[in-house]
Swiss-Prot record:
Pathway: Cofactor biosynthesis; pyridoxal 5'-phosphate biosynthesis. Catalyzes the hydrolysis of glutamine to glutamate and ammonia as part of the biosynthesis of pyridoxal 5'-phosphate. The resulting ammonia molecule is channeled to the active site of PdxS. L-glutamine binds at residues 47-49, 102, 128-129. In the presence of PdxS, forms a dodecamer of heterodimers. Only shows activity in the heterodimer. The keyword Lyase applies. This is Pyridoxal 5'-phosphate synthase subunit PdxT.
Amino acid sequence: MKIMGILGIQGDIEEHEDAVRKINCIPKRIRTVDDLEGIDALIIPGGESTTIGKLMVSYGFIDKIRNLKIPILGTCAGMVLLSKGTGKEQPLLDILNVTIKRNAYGSQKDSFEKEIVLGGKEIHAVFIRAPQVGDILSKDVEIISKDDENIVGVKQGNIMAISFHPELSDDGVIAYEYFLKNFVEKN
């Protein structure tokens, strides 16, 4: 059984753990850099990206995660943290060749749910102060999901990033299955 680490600094950690169990993987909450040992993949959940970034710096996660050779899934703020830039000064992992528009859909009250397609399957996506991809900075970045014309899912190498919260919808398991099949099992 594959072990999926979930960065346990902020966000819907328990909901991600439940989703990981649904795809017959073992969740492991990552609270220290030592916890990264022995995992097959890492999930960076949503939350507040500036706060998570500062905590990642404080706990020594930035360089450790940058040097991981395992698949990484970033959801919402996790997408922001993986990116090359946001137009705002904040700590980033700087490993996904995209720029991000933070809070592209507006404030908390502008949050919404919508059916979108990921990996050829329809999924009920929950967008909470969600980001969008601004610019794609290299040819190896592939678009895997859109909301109308807005890019809300990309992949590059062993990295997958989505701007919505799959852990908050009943069929969000589709996103985890996609990550497992297309990244974790191929690693």
